């Protein structure tokens, strides 16, 4: 089963910068399905109004752009349509999204209800060459029923996603790649990573989501941790990064991942497993202090720095059994992170 999965994902590549590249050249991250559910539940709860539709449209627009610009999914006028449709359906399983059944207008074993609905809308429109209004009903955990109503208006292809200001934009000319470090076990609906069902998500889906919620009001009275200090970003971006960091930290805290750290190499091994090997970027440890007052200085180069930041903070706190103070400076090269014990003020 593992050999079959390795073949299925043989064209997915890992770079020395802690990113994963899918066959089309797009960057993706490897997410546990339950992890994503936990993250999304936390992240959405911060907002004053529901943002579920924002995630659907982020997934739909991103997949629409992918299908519309990758020549492998170009639908011929006469012969060869079936081959393209099979390739489209195979993409679902390869990415771990579930089984798309457009003829039956349903999704089997969806990775996530909102993501699945968004991806399905893009595939249905691409396959039929028309625009549709979509409604969906989750019959149970295994099936989503889709209802499509044709729209007459012409809408241009969704544009390429724009990276947020806090994501490093400098291109590295010398990229070396290797095969995926993770062992993935294939299933009929996707794959498992260890004991957990997992999926690949394009990072551009997150970029589209970020811009759709940037500046939206949070819940009244919501306050972020006083122990996270961020510099180098404007107010709206800082608030969004705080929300991303807090939600990814809570996502990690819900896991049972064990962290034991005595040396810098111990810490770097955990970073490789939880950050770099899953596409969240590269972390360079610049200073590591063990003992009774542990601290660490790092530089983070990540396509999703807000999520990676929360993971690093919660991992460090679990490793040392105590909360920490986090100081983060965003610049044009990376995010500089300093984690150290909280100062206790005695009155």
Region roles according to the model:
Residues 296, 300-347:
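C-terminal structured interaction module
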Residues 126-131, 275-281, 316-323:
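Short secondary-structure junctions
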